[in-house]
Amino acid sequence: MAHTPQAKYRLDYQPPSHTITDIDLVFDLYDDATLVTAVSQVKQQQESNTLILDGETLELRALKVNGQDWQDYSVGEASLEIRGLPSEFTLTVVTKINPQANTALEGLYKSGGAFCTQCEAEGFRRITYYLDRPDVLARYTTTVIADKAQYPYLLSNGNKIAQGEQEAGRHWVKWQDPHPKPAYLFALVAGDFDVLRDQYVTQSGRQVALEIFVDKGNLDRAGHAMTSLINSMRWDEQRFGLEYDLDIYMIVAVDFFNMGAMENKGLNIFNSKFVLANEKTATDTDYLGIEAVIGHEYFHNWTGNRVTCRDWFQLSLKEGLTVFRDQEFSSDLGSRAVNRIGNVRIIRGPQFAEDASPMSHPIRPDKVIEMNNFYTLTVYEKGSEVIRMMHTLLGEEKFQRGMKLYFKRHDGTAATCEDFVAAMEDASGIDLQQFRLWYSQSGTPTLKVSSTYHAASQTYELTVEQHTEPTHDQKEKQPLHIPLDIELYAPNGDVIALQCNGKPVSNVLDVKQAKQTFRFEQVKQPPIPSLLREFSAPVKLEYAYSDEELIFLMVHARNEFARWDAGQMLLAKYIRTNVERVQQGQPVELAESVIDAFRGVLLSDNLDAEFVAEMLSLPSHNEVSGWYKRVDVDAIAQVLTSLKTILATELEDELSATYHTLKQDTYSIEHAAIGKRTLRNVCLSYLAYTAQGNALVQKQYAQANNMTDTIAAMTAANQAQLACRESLMQDYSEKWKHDGLVMDKWFTLQGSNPSPQVLDVIQQAMQHEAFSLKNPNRTRSLIGAFLNANPVNFHAKTGEGYRFAGHILRELNSSNPQVASRLIDPLLKFRLYDEQRQALIKQELEQLKAMDNLARDLFEKVSKALEA
């Protein structure tokens, strides 16, 4: 690299020298260039007559102070320094930018034929010179000018206050947002769309116009997004007492977008993946994803916009809290157990892996080179688990009291994680001093639990030891405050009430010490403990369960999550044992009692179908890899495929009967219908490994009247490498080649194809008319699937998978480093593999590091991996 990027540290935070109270923006949009005029009201905050503004890839055309041309300034690579300033002044900055050439998709850029923006975290500095930091909150007025025929819709934040015509076929619209906000929440869209309109009346009677803008021809795919938005608004009023505060709420769906969606005040910009759906183009998973993401961005209106972050190190303040809120929304509207299982799979798989990687960081990071790299599973998902632990410790009533106090203290300001914890502590009276360590300590704690039963005194003891391994960013670890939710069962399945010192005690144990013993009285027989119910803390659990105890919990646990977890622990025992067997050249085995336990689940008539589907799903290769300090990629893959084949063979009759019973003639996204489809397709995924697999999969594909069943058939054919795979893939491509979003599913299957020839398949797919490396969705679908969901081929000992990844990353480095940075993660953990693979991956990382123009996004990750 030409120069080494500098890190920023959380503890170096300084308030800004100046603040901006109001900004008036005018955008003159042309296809080859855009002129931006920014008129800001600036106030000195500290003794300084020098103002340093952020700015990147800008051409400065004019600079005025109080209407006069200003000469005392200098332009740096990423800043504008203005000197000799009065304490209060009007600053006018005119910049020229080229959205058409902006492939990084940060700031103002073109997506298809439309102009749109992405300003979080630091994109506004690519639009104009500004104090681009979240603790500078200004009121925005925005005028957008463009050609009327090409761009009939001109949108920005807030409420529309004026519009008019200009000569030469141009027109303008003026927007005003009365709520002060940081620059990252600014948004602008100009284009020609189809619009779905509705309205919502808030609990206080405010009429809110709802508008969803989609590409022409996609109006019939916007209905579910609108339903989800209305459900979100109603839910936030009912559960949190929070209502919307503008007269209009707009969502725009765009095809070129680095993230999932963005909560800009009053004008959300969404990746079209999280807006567009009908039964022909979207799966049940897509429908549920849209509901969750629409909810997430709407909930940010209070947790993120009304109260924002003081600095980017506090990102989890808005994201951890809002993920918790969107998870609760999905759980209240759907199946709480199934949603919880989905959340936990993410934590136990990729988030635990992130904790163990060279990029490990606490949910409130201390050191950052490129902020985009910290939009992570740790900050978001683990951040949400930290909020959930507070909810567990406080209970719903006190938690809501804490939320109200938080808004009372901080509405309209930029706050910190500490502010949130203090509000929870003060409102509840519960001491969270030790709990705060969750914000500053990285890594995954392990809880080692052992038990002793004393028959004479009828007492039962649980001894809990907690330990967090040193991580790449922190060597010293302290004991955390961990809520451990437990239940004890008598051998007949009855729940044993927890008592200590003659009094009832809570199911949630406060684990605070490195080693702690909890003693329970009046336990008349040796009990079976259900531990870490609801995954009450993001930790690894070690307890020496017997097969019989786990099978007992699969049947008797009152809590559905605990039943699922017992099944997962049972599978984990056999996966570990069989990995060792395979390494010693022995065949994979599964005990009859385990097969019978899963047969019982399949035949159970008192369990929700969607929950049964989860019970029957094996842990992923990525999750299993996380159990090992040295990963044997091939042995794990062989064991998982063999276990699936054994279960398919042994349970073929039951799977087949269930599959045929669950057929539905009409498609509906009611949760019961989704559950039946999910279980039916899990049965198909097993039956694909039996003699009837090929015929069954072909028949389902031919008869499918919805995308869920279509993709389930194709996935089964892909994973089991059935003879019909090629014809199904060909047929799908012919049908959908003109729809990039629908083709993403096809690209994902091509990238995850287990065939040893997969790289040839991927190279061919990259030539497909629907593919473009410039489109993040296409790239994530094809390349991301290969890197993250095709472990055997990605880690092929020839090194060709690594070389392919390196080639793609070098290409993306200059066009879209943010997408490159997301894709590189599987390479960072190279020390988990054998020496041959380590050397091959290291070679690719070193080639990247040696690039002259290596982007900060990649530099930070590559450097940490090589130093680890």
Where do the language-model regions lie?
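Long, ordered, helix-rich scaffold segments
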Residues: 349, 521-868
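Extended, low-hydrophobicity, Ser/Thr/Pro/Gly-biased non-transmembrane segments
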Residues: 94-197, 560-563
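N-terminal, polar/Ser/Thr-rich
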Residues: 1-35, 109-118, 130, 134, ...
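Surface-exposed beta-strand/loop patches in extracellular or lumenal glycoproteins
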Residues: 39-58, 129-132, 138-147, 418, ...
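Short acidic/polar inter-strand loop motif in beta-rich domains
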Residues: 97-104, 469-470, 535-541
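Beta-strand-rich binding/interaction modules
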Residues: 49, 59-66, 431-434, 444-531, ...
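A surface-exposed beta-strand-loop module
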Residues: 45-47, 51, 55-111, 510-526
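Hydrophobic alpha-helical and helix-loop surface patches within well-folded domains
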Residues: 175, 203-464
